[in-house]
């Protein structure tokens, strides 16, 4: 394992550990997103599994919220969730060309498998909380790549 992968693993452990303070978890999520999105030396072979981990964690988080009374938009309650959402959206914004490369139909299979629709349409409403610039770019890219408005 290289330094970059070890750093990502360290950040991932901090993000998903509920015993860590929320601010530490959120900072870890923010670093993951920035690192995956902007570090040119991070290959797609590393980016995809990290996105898979983040998105899977988001879906599990949503599963746990579906039956609860705290399933509403609140940064104080769900800060690490929103941080992970922004990490995913930010990474997708900067890596979408690589993630969608090749045949359009085949290229769309990967983002479809992530089920962004469930995340963005959830009661936690991450598009309301994440940075507007990230949300706007994410929405524009998903709209453009689907040839019309919609979430794969």
From Swiss-Prot:
PANTHER family attached to this UniProt entry: RNA POLYMERASE I-SPECIFIC TRANSCRIPTION INITIATION FACTOR RRN3-RELATED, TRANSCRIPTION INITIATION FACTOR IA RRN3
TM annotation in the entry: none
Family: Belongs to the RRN3 family.
Protein name as annotated: Putative RRN3-like protein RRN3P1
One example GO MF annotation: RNA polymerase I general transcription initiation factor activity
GO terms (BP aspect): transcription initiation at RNA polymerase I promoter
Pfam families: RRN3
């Amino acid at each position: 394992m290289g330094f970059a992968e070890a750093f990502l693993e360290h950040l991932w452990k901090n993000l998903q550990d509920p015993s860590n303070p929320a601010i530490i978890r959120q900072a870890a999520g923010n670093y993951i997103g920035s690192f995956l999105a902007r570090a040119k030396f991070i290959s797609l072979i590393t980016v995809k599994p990290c996105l898979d981990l983040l998105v899977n964690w988001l879906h599990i988080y949503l599963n746990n919220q579906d039956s609860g009374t705290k399933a509403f938009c609140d940064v104080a309650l769900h800060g690490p969730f929103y941080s992970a959402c922004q990490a995913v959206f930010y990474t997708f914004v900067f890596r979408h060309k690589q993630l969608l490369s090749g045949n359009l139909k085949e290229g769309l299979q990967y983002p479809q498998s992530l089920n962004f629709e469930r995340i963005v349409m959830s009661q936690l409403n991450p598009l309301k909380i994440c940075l507007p610039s990230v949300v706007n770019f994410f929405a524009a890219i998903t709209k453009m790549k689907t040839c019309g408005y919609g979430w794969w």
